[in-house]
Amino acid sequence: RLLFTFNCRRFNNLEEIDEFAPDLVINAATVKYTIEAFNKVLPHLPEKCILSDIASVKTGLPEFYAKCGHPFVSTHPMFGPTFASLSNLSNENAIIIAESDHLGKVFFKDLYNELHLHIEEYTFSQHDETIAYSLSIPFASTLVFAGCMKHQDAPGTTFKRHLMIANGLMSEDDYLLSEILFNPHTSGQLEKIQAKLSQLQVIVENHDSEAMKHYLEEVRNNLK
């Protein structure tokens, strides 16, 4: 069925890879098993086969690629089935790692362009910094919201939207959430959240209307 419907072939054992001799292997294993999956197939791959991962967490991958003896291409589609509309990805983004093999980058640029994704090229280091900002901040903020919430019989629209995001986040794999939050750059982002919360708390406790006005103006400017 896979062969005739999707032009795919399912292998029943690793030895079938030897005969197939792929030019590119895309690793779609969960973050916890990405490197383990690579190690299992490596003995069966041609020397020039390009290794590819689409992992959201790149921990350990630069070191693995440096010693694996194969060209590689590492990318990160910045969306998932929880919130993205997979039938329309024109508003979604993808990152291609700059250190990747040229041919591998060309392949994924063509693929992501066909999906109408916006593409950015970052180094491994820049990717980690970006993830700390774009994932760790909303993840941490959502966890704080969910950690403080209690059941509401008549929730407002804003609460329901936050609740929907929280439920979506908590449906993700615990290991994935942990690894994203354990990003070395996350701690600095959490400090910024704490600083802003402390500032807001002082304003609220003092009923300082002028300070609140400036605070809200600053937030609106950040959203531009």
What are the residue ranges of the model-derived segments?
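Rossmann-like NAD(P)-binding element
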Residues: 15-42
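Redox-cofactor binding/interface segments in oxidoreductases and associated redox assembly factors
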Residues: 25-27, 52-53, 96
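Rossmann-fold dinucleotide-binding core
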Residues: 57-122, 128
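NAD(P)-binding Rossmann-fold cofactor-contacting core
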Residues: 1-16
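Short, conserved loop/helix-junction motifs that constitute active-site signature segments
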Residues: 42-48, 88-89
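Short, basic, helix/turn surface patches
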Residues: 16, 39, 100-107, 145-156
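An accessory alpha-helical subdomain
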Residues: 121-224
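ADP-ribose/adenylate-binding Rossmann-like module
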Residues: 45-61
